[in-house]
Each structure stands twice: as structure tokens, then as C-alpha cells.
Amino acid sequence: MDDPDGNIELIRRIYGFDWAAVGKRADGFDRLRDLVSDDFQSQMSAELGGRTIGVDGLALFVEALEQDFSEFHYEAEEFIPGDGDKVVVAGRIRCVGRASKVPLSQEFGHVWTIADGTPTHVEAHMSRAEALSAAR
């Protein structure tokens, strides 16, 4: 059953801690594991490709980012109800290149799917517009 307000608050909790941050990852992924389904899946953006299964799979993907970035985190700016049990999160990725020390910023859009009050899937996009389109 659709509960847009409840779904948004649930997803907002996920972005309330920096689960992808370098140096904070272990605690962040423990907290993420408490909120999502055991078979949680992450679909990476078309530019990156790939899918991870479970929080451990997502953790391995994020760990690989540490090779390129000394800092990496998501800044969620908007939580938007999508169709059915979907929530769109739009914001910016902020990171710093490990070798170059250059700060980078990139728009992102995530489409979360919730089943029975538990997030089961997130689909990553490189823009708010792409995520909104995918959530319809």
C-alpha cells in the first residue's frame, strides 16, 4: 500500500548518515543494513553500469571508489514521491580526487523502491530529470 509520506521519511533516514563516506563506511553500512531488505539491490547509473546485491555488494562498490577519491559523499537535496512505492532523491555527489586533490561535484538522482515498508532497490541516475523519468 502506498504511503508517500512514510516512504519519504524512511528514505530520508538513509541519507541522514553518510553511508558512502570514506572513513565512515563501516558504521554507515551497518546502519544501512538495518533499514533495507536482505536482498537489497543497487542498479548503478548507465555510465558506470552494473548491479550489486545486498549491502555487502554495495559496500564493495563504494570501497572501490576509495581508490580514486579521498572524500566521497551524497548530499540529498530533494525527496520526491514517485509512482506507487517509489521515492526519488535528488542532490549532489561531492568528492575529492585522491591523486589530484581536485574537488568534484556531480548531480545525482536515486529512485528507491519500497515494498512492505522496506527499501528493496535503488536505481542510480546522473541527474534529477533522469531519475524523475524513471520513477514514473
Predicted regions and their residues:
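A short, polar/proline- and glycine-enriched secondary-structure boundary/capping micro-motif
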Residues: G54, A99-V102, E130-R136
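Short beta-strand edge/turn micro-motifs at domain boundaries
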Residues: E107-S133
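Hydrophobic/aromatic beta-strand elements that line small-molecule binding cavities or substrate pockets
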Residues: Y74-I80, R94, E107-T113
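Short acidic-aromatic low-complexity motifs
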Residues: M1-D39
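Generic short beta-strand segments
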Residues: A90-V96
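A solvent-exposed, acidic/Ser-Thr-rich amphipathic alpha-helical stretch
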Residues: F29-V87
